[in-house]
């Protein structure tokens, strides 16, 4: 990439073979579009369909299921093989579909705004889509327009560009088209100092300019950052790690159990084919086949709920990660604040007050308002606004007193002007006022006040005394103490329109001051208080000045003392170790660069925190990637920031992050309920089969029974638990520890309930055989002593009790401490519906002959059904007794 800033205008035009007057021809532009490609940021290469499918099946659990399906098919159990294969295919389809939806959402975000560019081609100005701009195009710039590519400026008129998307600096930068010989050195000049360059995705806030396109698409400065992002890998979230660990563990357990059971069967001299099927039964029992799909579906439902809270989840695991966040690092502008400068105070005619108390009937204060509106190059109405944010704030203030710029300029026509420049820090305009002429001047108080010789007080022009100056400066200091940006205003009267522009800003008459600030969002303070209750720390990170940052932070309750702030220069001079030792006591970082943000996030994560980071600019992308949860702004955010983030806020509001955290906590809690339910049920199945084989009994459950229970009977309650109503106290709890296991404190519960379900199933198996044969021997269960019909009846009883007891057990998962009767059985209508559907389907399997043949089950008597129902409610009764005992 050439250092275009170090070349003269003529040399740049020669190198790019273009012409300032005529631009490129359409023919050459078309050729260059083919040569350089479209002027847009490339997305990460999409995975092929086969790559996506392989990613979904590349898992230990899935491999065990595939082997089980192959063995089932080999021994002629086609029903079992088909069901297992269906499970594998369904899981893969759900995963692939979910990934495709995420990609579609990304594409939609990219297309939300397709900016246009005005270029000169064949000597004519044409508006074209920005992606069609090519190197050598002559591009026109004016206020309010986004810059379509990297430009070497060749003509400017008071051009200001807001480069925060690239550099992080929110104050617009003055641009020129001048060749700077000092930039000829070998050292790379920082982007912020390349005054004769304008960069892709930055915004013109003032003036106009002409530039020649030098770099487009991925060759632009923003493209370079996008390239780095594509090379970065994403870390796994705690839930992903836990599920991956569970998957591997269960896979190995399934294989180990199969081997052990096969050896036991061999020692017991059992039939080889029977042991194959028993081993498959155990493998299937050990694996919660519906788990991946259930987790994905619950997360997807959570995503839909979050959309209603103005939160778009780009990556499903971010839902869970949000729930474990311990620190929210938030940008100030637009997220904690309203992102619009607002005039809040004024000083005029010896009066210092809030703007709402300004008196338009007071001649001095009215002239202050007129100056604010007339000495102004911005435009504003209810539908749109263009120009510098400070000037827009002045117009908004005027409009609240019914002073519209269009109307005032008709009465007081502008006849001359002296534009703002960064050296004078002032701007002046000349207007007609009845039979005379007024020059209106606004600017920084340190530049304007020394040029004032008089003051307008009580409707009269008086000499400006030292006492007056002291009073003015004290008013300015009062505004500064409240972190307000201070602007001063003056005027001068003329009898003729022949005004000497060189002396326009001399011997001025002081009118007044205004103080403005980007005020906090009204709802944010309550959200930060809620975060504190939830054990979440809010850290403000901003490029703004220390005093402004502290004023906002104090008002919002983020910081209480100035010692809780660190500025960028201090971060430069502190080691990572020192920062880590201090970071727990720092709540605000001011005047920071993108590199500082990454350093802060690293330090916070090194202390074991789960960090959420907000950002909107390209420069924020590295820190968004570095954080556990990157949150991009949907309104002001760049495509690169959105691409780097896990979450996008459609309203750019801090309160939406807090709502997302609450939703994330509830979703994680519900997913945990679903997983514990599935695993306790699977453990019950393993207990049933393991004990039966160990005792030398016939197999109490067939593979198809276990598959049915795992895929259908268990899946509906697991999904229903995944959408359990929100816990109103969830934001009163501290965040869970980053290393906390998914099963923390839950293993005894899981094992106990698994044993209960397993033993109840075995009791049903014993009773089924006894009821059918009438054998007085307690255990007529050895394969050689039980006939086929009796075994069928016993397996049917075991199958029904296993299914029903698991359905009832699902109600235990709603709360481990509160009784289901105090929560309310019907407060989760989906769970009640799942229970009814599960019972109905089970009855159909037993009662409808074709289904009974497929599942290998036997009709039950009224006595059988009564016994089954009695056994099935025991898990609920036992858990309610335990809860009551703990409570007392």
UniProtKB/Swiss-Prot annotation:
The chain crosses the membrane at residues 53-75, 79-97, 246-266, 283-303, 675-695, 703-723, 747-767, 791-811, 831-851, 865-885. It is an enzyme of class 7 (translocase). One of its GO terms (cellular component) is plasma membrane. Ca(2+) binds at residues 284-285, 287, 289, 710, 714. It comes from the Bacteria. GO terms for molecular function: ATP binding; ATP hydrolysis activity; metal ion binding; P-type calcium transporter activity. Its EC number is 7.2.2.10. The active site is at residue 331. It is a multi-pass membrane protein. It is found in: Cell membrane. PROSITE patterns: ATPASE_E1_E2 (PS00154). InterPro entries: ATPase_P-typ_cation-transptr_C, ATPase_P-typ_cation-transptr_N, ATPase_P-typ_cyto_dom_N, ATPase_P-typ_P_site, ATPase_P-typ_TM_dom_sf, ATPase_P-typ_transduc_dom_A_sf, HAD-like_sf, HAD_sf. SMART domains: Cation_ATPase_N. Its main location: membrane. Keywords: ATP-binding, Calcium, Calcium transport, Cell membrane, Ion transport, Membrane, Metal-binding, Nucleotide-binding, Phosphoprotein, Translocase, Transmembrane, Transmembrane helix, Transport. Inhibited by cyclopiazonic acid (CPA). It catalyses: Ca(2+)(in) + ATP + H2O = Ca(2+)(out) + ADP + phosphate + H(+). Pfam families: Cation_ATPase, Cation_ATPase_C, Cation_ATPase_N, E1-E2_ATPase. Belongs to the cation transport ATPase (P-type) (TC 3.A.3) family. Type IIA subfamily. Catalyzes the hydrolysis of ATP coupled with the transport of calcium. NCBIfam families: ATPase_P-type. This is Calcium-transporting ATPase 1. It comes from Bacillus cereus (strain ATCC 10987 / NRS 248).
């Amino acid at each position: 990439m050439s250092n275009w800033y170090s070349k003269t205008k003529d040399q740049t035009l020669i190198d790019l073979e273009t012409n300032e007057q005529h631009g490129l021809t359409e023919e050459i532009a078309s050729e260059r579009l083919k040569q350089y490609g479209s002027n847009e940021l490339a997305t990460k290469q999409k995975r092929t369909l086969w790559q996506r499918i392989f990613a979904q099946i590349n898992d230990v659990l899935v491999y065990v299921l595939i082997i089980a399906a192959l063995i089932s098919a080999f021994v002629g159990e086609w029903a079992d093989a088909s069901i297992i294969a269906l499970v594998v295919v369904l899981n893969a389809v759900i995963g692939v579909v979910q990934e495709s939806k995420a990609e579609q959402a990304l594409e939609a975000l990219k297309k939300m705004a397709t900016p246009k560019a005005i270029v000169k081609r064949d000597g004519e100005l044409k508006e074209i889509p920005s992606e069609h701009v090519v190197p050598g195009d002559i591009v026109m710039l004016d206020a309010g327009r986004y810059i379509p590519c990297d430009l070497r400026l060749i003509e400017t008129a008071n051009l200001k560009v807001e480069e925060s998307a690239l550099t992080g600096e929110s104050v617009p930068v003055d641009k020129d088209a001048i060749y700077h010989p000092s930039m000829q050195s070998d050292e790379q000049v920082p982007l912020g100092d390349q005054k004769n360059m304008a960069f892709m995705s930055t915004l013109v806030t003032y003036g106009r300019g002409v530039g020649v396109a030098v770099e487009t698409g991925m060759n632009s400065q923003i493209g370079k950052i996008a390239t780095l992002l594509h090379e970065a890998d994403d870390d796994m979230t705690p839930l992903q790690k836990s599920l991956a660990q569970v998957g591997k563990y269960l896979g190995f357990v399934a294989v180990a159990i199969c081997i052990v059971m096969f050896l036991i069967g061999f020692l017991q001299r059992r039939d080889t084919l029977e042991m194959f099927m028993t081993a498959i039964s155990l493998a299937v029992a050990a694996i919660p086949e519906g788990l991946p799909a259930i987790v994905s579906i619950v997360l997807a439902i959570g995503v839909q709920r979050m959309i209603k809270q103005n939160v778009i989840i780009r990556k499903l695991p971010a839902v869970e990660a949000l729930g474990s966040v311990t620190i929210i690092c938030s940008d100030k502008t637009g997220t904690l604040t309203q992102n619009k400068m607002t005039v809040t105070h004024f000083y005029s005619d010896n009066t210092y007050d809030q703007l709402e108390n300004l008196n338009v009937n007071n001649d001095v204060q009215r002239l202050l308002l007129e100056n604010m509106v007339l000495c102004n190059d911005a435009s504003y109405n209810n539908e749109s606004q263009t120009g510098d944010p400070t000037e827009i704030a002045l117009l908004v203030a005027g409009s609240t007193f019914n002073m519209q710029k269009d109307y005032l300029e008709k009465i007081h026509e502008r006849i001359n002007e002296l534009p703002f420049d960064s050296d004078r820090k002032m701007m002046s305009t000349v207007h007609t006022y009845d039979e005379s002429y007024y020059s209106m001047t606004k600017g920084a108080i340190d530049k304007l006040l020394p040029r004032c010789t008089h003051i307008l007080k009580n409707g009269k022009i008086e000499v400006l005394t030292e006492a007056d100056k002291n009073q003015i400066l004290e008013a300015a200091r009062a505004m500064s103490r409240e972190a307000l940006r201070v602007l001063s205003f003056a005027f001068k009267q003329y009898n003729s329109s022949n005004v000497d522009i060189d002396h326009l800003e001399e011997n001025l008459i002081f009118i007044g001051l205004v103080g403005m600030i980007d005020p906090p969002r009204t709802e944010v303070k309550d959200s930060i208080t809620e975060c504190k209750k939830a054990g979440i720390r809010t850290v403000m990170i901003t490029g703004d000045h220390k005093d402004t940052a502290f004023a906002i932070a104090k008002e919002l309750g983020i910081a209480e003392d100035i010692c809780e702030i660190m500025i960028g220069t201090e971060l430069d001079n502190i080691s990572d170790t020192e920062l880590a030792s201090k970071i727990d006591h720092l709540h605000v970082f001011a005047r920071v660069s993108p590199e500082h943000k990454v350093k802060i996030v690293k330090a916070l994560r090194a202390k074991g925190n789960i960090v959420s980071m907000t950002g909107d600019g390209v420069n924020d992308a590295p820190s968004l990637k570095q954080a556990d949860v990157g949150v991009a702004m949907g309104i002001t955010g760049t495509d690169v920031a959105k691409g780097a983030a896990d979450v996008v806020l459609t309203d750019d509001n801090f309160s939406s992050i807090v709502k997302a955290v609450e939703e994330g906590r509830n979703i994680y809690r519900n997913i945990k309920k679903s997983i514990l339910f599935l695993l306790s049920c699977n453990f019950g199945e393993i207990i049933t089969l393991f004990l039966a084989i160990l005792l030398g009994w016939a197999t109490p459950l067939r593979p198809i029974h276990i598959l049915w229970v795992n895929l259908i009977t268990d899946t509906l309650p697991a999904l229903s638990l995944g959408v359990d109503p929100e816990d109103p106290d969830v934001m009163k709890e501290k965040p869970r520890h980053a290393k906390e296991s998914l099963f923390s404190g839950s293993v005894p519960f899981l094992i106990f309930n698994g044993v209960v379900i397993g033993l109840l199933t075995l009791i049903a198996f014993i009773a089924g055989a006894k009821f059918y044969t009438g054998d007085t021997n307690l255990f007529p269960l050895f394969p050689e002593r039980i006939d086929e019909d009796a075994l069928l009846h016993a397996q049917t009883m075991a199958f029904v009790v296993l299914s029903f007891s698991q359905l009832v057990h699902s109600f235990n998962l709603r709360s481990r401490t509160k009784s289901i009767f105090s929560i309310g059985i019907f407060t989760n209508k989906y769970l009640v519906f799942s229970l009814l559907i599960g019972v109905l389907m089970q009855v159909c399997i037993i009662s409808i002959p074709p289904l009974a043949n497929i599942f290998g089950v036997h009709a039950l008597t009224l006595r059988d059904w009564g016994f089954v129902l009695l056994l099935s409610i025991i898990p609920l009764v036992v858990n309610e007794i335990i809860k009551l005992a703990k409570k007392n």
